[in-house]
UniProtKB/Swiss-Prot annotation:
Biological process annotations from GO: secondary metabolite biosynthetic process
Active site: 169 (proton donor), 173 (lowers pka of active site tyr)
Signals that turn on the gene: Expression is up-regulated during co-cultivation of A.fumigatus with Streptomyces rapamycinicus that triggersthe production of the polyketide fumigermin during the bacterial-fungal interaction.
Family: Belongs to the short-chain dehydrogenases/reductases (SDR) family.
GO terms of molecular function: oxidoreductase activity, acting on the CH-OH group of donors, NAD or NADP as acceptor
Residues where NADP(+) binds: 19, 67, 94, 169, 173, 213
UniProt keyword terms in alphabetical order: NADP, Oxidoreductase
Record's protein name: Short-chain dehydrogenase/reductase AFUA_1G00990
Superkingdom assignment: Eukaryota
Length: 261
């Protein structure tokens, strides 16, 4: 994708602050011909984000209310995108959460905690992706970029490197990575079987790293969110196929790197 490419319709979930906001900020300046759909659970916070982005030079922004755990919101978002644009070129599944330092006090709380993480980071990614798949298939080169974490890499977790240990969050990201691989294989098999003429969706996983945002309580050693957005923006802009799909990618020390499973 370069400045001469046709307009892309890009939807980012969880985009009113933090990483999602930074993705639209960085991509909007780099690829100004695109239209960016900013999704937010709180419409007022979403409106504030849109104003801030426009002040920073990102002009083509649409706002959609979307709680990824709410099926009515998802269905309404799909209807909006279909009515306004007729297709979707890039879906960035960014919405997520973590509770650092949280301790469950009983088994019921523990079960509820795990269910909430899995619902947001696995089930909702699957449901949102499924809901938008017909619109993605109308794109000439559709992409889905799922946002993971270093805690989603089993290799990294088993290494001695310094990492925050949040088992329910990390396990949910491991699951999301696995889901992404399965979705890519299913899409490959659909194309190979000749069941439909729709273009193949390319699925990617992006690890933005630990960021200095509200998500991490603005942890002191975190990267700026714009730096974390770089891997997502580069995957978004890859039209030459230089990045393998269904792989985990990060942007560190000025280059894109594959993250081990």
């Amino acid at each position: 994708m370069d400045s001469n490419s046709s307009n892309k319709i890009v939807l980012v979930t969880g985009a009113n602050q933090g990483l999602g906001f930074a993705v639209i900020e960085v991509a909007g300046v780099r690829y100004p011909s695109n239209t960016y759909i900013l999704c937010a659970r709180d419409i007022e916070k979403g409106q504030q984000a849109v104003h801030q982005l426009r002040d920073r030079g990102v002009a083509a922004i649409d706002l959609v209310e979307l709680d990824v755990t709410n099926d009515d919101h998802i269905a309404a978002a799909v209807r909006h995108v279909e009515a306004q644009y007729g297709r979707l070129d890039v879906l960035v599944n960014n919405a997520g959460f973590v509770r650092l330092g949280h301790q469950d006090t009983n088994l019921s709380e523990m079960r509820a905690t795990y269910n909430e993480y899995m619902n947001v980071h696995i089930t909702s990614v699957a449901v949102v992706t499924h809901a938008f798949t017909p619109l993605l298939h109308r794109s000439p080169a559709p992409k889905v970029i799922n946002v993971t974490s270093g805690l989603g890499s089993i290799t990294n977790v088993l290494s001695p490197r310094r990492m925050a240990r949040v088992p329910p969050y990390g396990a949910s990201k491991v699951g999301m990575n696995g889901l992404t691989a399965h979705l890519q294989v299913s899409e490959n098999e659909r194309v190979a079987a000749g069941e439909a003429k729709a273009p193949r969706i390319r699925f990617f996983i992006s690890n933005p790293g630990l960021l200095k945002t509200a998500f991490s309580n603005y942890i002191a050693w975190g990267k700026e969110p714009q730096a974390g957005a770089e891997s997502i923006v580069q995957l978004m802009g890859d039209e030459e196929g230089k990045f393998d799909h269904a792989m985990q990618w990060e942007h560190e020390e000025g280059e894109m790197r594959v993250v081990p499973w």
